[in-house]
Amino acid sequence: MGEFTLNYNGEFGKHRLNALVGYTLQKKTYDRVAVEATGFPDDRIHEVTAHGPNASDIGLYSSDTRKAAWTMMSYLARVNYSFDNRYVVTGTVRTDGSSRFGKENRWGWFPSISLGWTISNEKFYQDLLGNNSSLKLRASWGLSGNNNIGNYEHTATMSQGGYVYGNTVETAYWQGTFKDAAIGWEKTSQYNVGFDLGLFNGRVNLIGNYYNSLSYDLLYDQPISSISGSSSVKTNLKNAKVRNSGVDFQIDGRILTGDFKWNVSANISVNRNKVVDLGGINDLYLVSERNVVSHVTRSGLPIGSFYGYIADGIISEKDYTNIMIDKSNLVNGKFPDGYQLIGPAVPNYNNIHPGDVKWRDVDKNGLITENDREILGNAYPDFTYGISTDFSYKNFDLRATFTGSQGAEVINFQKYYLYNMEGSGNQLASVLNRWHSDENPGSGGVFRAARSSTPNTSQRLSSYMVDDASYFRCANITLGYNFPVKWMQKVSVQALRLYVSVDNLFTLTDYEGYNPEVDYKGNNLLPGFDWGVYPLARTYSIGCLLYTSDA
């Protein structure tokens, strides 16, 4: 990576000017050659080429060769002007060219501007409130770009194979992948307003921000007809827009009393995500594990909203009697005209039994079909928050960090496996309190044990799998001791600190899974899907920091 910049700084009375122009170039290459082989005469030989004279005895197991490169070129400029430490204006502009896009839309233009007003430096403020507090107002707008795609999404490749022509097989070439040569930058326009407030000579500070961003020209794998040779093409959804808006606040405080010092910081954030427009295309239905449709992206809703059937409790033995009466009147999968349903709706496949999950018949036709699927929730929390604190008394210090989330939901797809009760694997402890009979219904939240029908009825993706993922977590706590300086000077040591630390000490949550913070293969269109990834580890550390004196 290379960066070349030219700076200018000037001060003229109450005016200050800072300017920068620059050029950056970065390139990343990936070159891999991997070979596996068997048949070496000695386990201590680690080189494939070190086979000795009997090369024919070595069996090449597999080989893999990959090579890729990515380049970004940027031109940038920034001007910052301030007057009398009260008013600040900053303008920036940059243009970026990415090799990940085709020549038609390779370059993106990204300007921004920000304004600041330090009200506490105004005479009227100081006359009214004095010098014990500070207040600054901020506002900004900027345009940013996203090129987070593969390296060659704009370049089609050719495939080769045999083609029978007459009595001979000829070599044939065809377009193996379909690409959009005009693919370009995804862009986000964002407005921000905020304030910085300091009280009691800086002992208490409050920061507040409001933001509103609109992303457009969204990068997306657009499904296409397989006749093209590909199932999808990476492209920009030209008229699609997604909005994120929210507020965040942070308060910092410090207490200094003799040998006792205490710093504490707390923050809270609220974000709302909404698909404004999908650019005229239909709803995006996304498939996750076991080829199950679990999410939908739809105009007016958050990205990747949960989608499935609505569970309405557990079917009782009385319900089952009514179902059998109803089912005997089915004609070609439909009820006769004027027929009044007595029991729960009948699924469109497989029989149901007492103890199975009862599904809501959304369209009121007496049958449970794909048309009965509804929006079940989403993975976005009502708010997130964090607390960090730092105590010190003489040479001892205690630091702790806490994080939390309230109102988020998760599709706990582990229930598909951990509630199957087929004897093929471990189960959640809550299955001990499952439904057995109307006289012993258990907790009312776990369906019956079954061997074959359960996966086809009770384990379809539904609100039954949607769990509250709110949590409060101690992310880290550290206790330390700093040895007195006068002791260390005697052994030519500048400073010595011993500490013990624990990461992920505890998590308070009602979520049954390993971790309420989940991610499905990094796919932003499938948020909040828990398929049983490795749990978050708890780490214990003991260490020391030693600073030696200069010679």
Which ranges hold each PLM region?
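Outer-membrane beta-barrel transmembrane domain signature of Gram-negative proteins
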Residues: 1-86, 141, 178, 373-375, ...
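Extracytoplasmic gating/loop element in the C-terminal half of outer-membrane beta-barrel translocons
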Residues: 98, 351-354, 405-503, 519
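Surface-exposed extracellular loop regions of Gram-negative outer-membrane beta-barrel proteins
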Residues: 1-12, 16, 70-102, 106-121, ...
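Surface-exposed loop/turn segments flanking beta-strands in extracellular/periplasmic regions
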Residues: 1, 31-62, 153-178, 227-234, ...
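Outer-membrane beta-barrel signature, preferentially recognizing the C-terminal barrel domain
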Residues: 53-74, 164-205, 234-257, 300-307, ...
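Transmembrane beta-strands of outer-membrane beta-barrel pores
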Residues: 23-29, 64, 93-99, 119-121, ...
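Conserved small/polar residues in nucleotide/adenosyl-binding loops
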Residues: 547-551
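Conserved small-residue
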Residues: 34-36, 41, 256-377, 503
